Amino acid sequence: MRKIISLFFAIFLTLSSVQAENVTKTINSLINKDAVSVSVKDISNNKEVYSLNKKAPMIPASTLKLVTSSAALNTLGSDYEFSTKLYKSSNNDLYLKLGADPFLTSSDLKKMMTVAKEKNILEPKNIYIDSSIFDNVEWGEGWQWDDEMNPLMPKFSAYNIDENLLNIEITPSMQNMPPSIVVKPFYPLTFMNLITTDITLSKNDISIVKNLNFAQNVYDAKGEITKIENIKMPIPNLQRYFKLRLDDVINAQKIDYNKGYPNAILPTKNIYLVTSVAHKMPDAMESILKTSNNLVAETVFKLAGAKWAEEKGSISNSLGMLKFYISSLNIPTDDVKIVDGSG
């Protein structure tokens, strides 16, 4: 996949001199040309500069990020910030306004509640969460049920936090005995622990799969282990995980509150900003285009759709934004079907 992305960057750079033969050389040096379908046009005059198997249908995979991230960047702007804000009302209520920040961490929540405590906010009447920036769809069209164990494809929502991944720490015990399995930080999962400790092995051979015969959040852990192993897996319920981490930081700051976190829209009057955390667009573009991060790509795509439509983020708004952007470049889209932001 990195070769494919490198290929397209090379094509774009080559086009500055409009030398089709260099494009051909680049393609032949990087990948098997029979596996490529590409058409390169000069957008200033819509003339084709180079093509190869241009009518062959192909799944773009993560090369799609070049298109969707360009449209999103054009819509949001390079100075866009992913922000999470904490407000206080005159009624002593707190409002946590989520911005679907794909870089938000539990440490960021801790910083926010530390500031709240420093401002003597010790006994809030209620703590509300405003998650209205996105709809409730957390996966892209075509994502499969068995993708939910893939750490490269976590769910994404207004409640993005900690890369939307759990860390499962598996620690061997005595020979032929089951290891300990701990979720750090805590999240309620049940494991059917069928792993055996074998100190004679040179490496671990472990698998964790969802058990479809029992209730949700039950997993089969199988294999053999000889040393500590940490496994990343997507968070099953982002909202639940987020609220657990919010509990952690509120309790750590000794803020007196135990009433839950109902959803509510941030009021427009009688509130003031307590504190906020933010991350910048260049970090997102680097994450999308250098490491092909699906979580960041999907989040940015959905945020751009929200801004373009001036309403809640949804895939339909994102696709509308994308079509508008591509049309502005005089590129026909009649034969193109795009269903998500990451490919």
Describe each region flagged by the PLM.
Residues 76-333:
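Conserved serine DD-peptidase/penicillin-binding transpeptidase domain
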Residues 58-72:
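Active/ligand-binding-proximal structured segments within catalytic/core domains
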Residues 53, 109-114, 340-341:
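N-terminal post-signal-peptidase region of extra-cytosolic proteins
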Residues 6-16:
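Bacterial N-terminal signal peptides
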Residues 52-58, 232, 343:
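A short glycine/serine-rich beta->alpha loop
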Residues 18-57, 76-82, 115-123:
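Beta-lactamase-like hydrolase cores
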Residues 312, 335-343:
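Extended C-terminal subregions enriched in glycine
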Residues 1-4:
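Positively charged n-region of N-terminal signal peptides that target proteins for export
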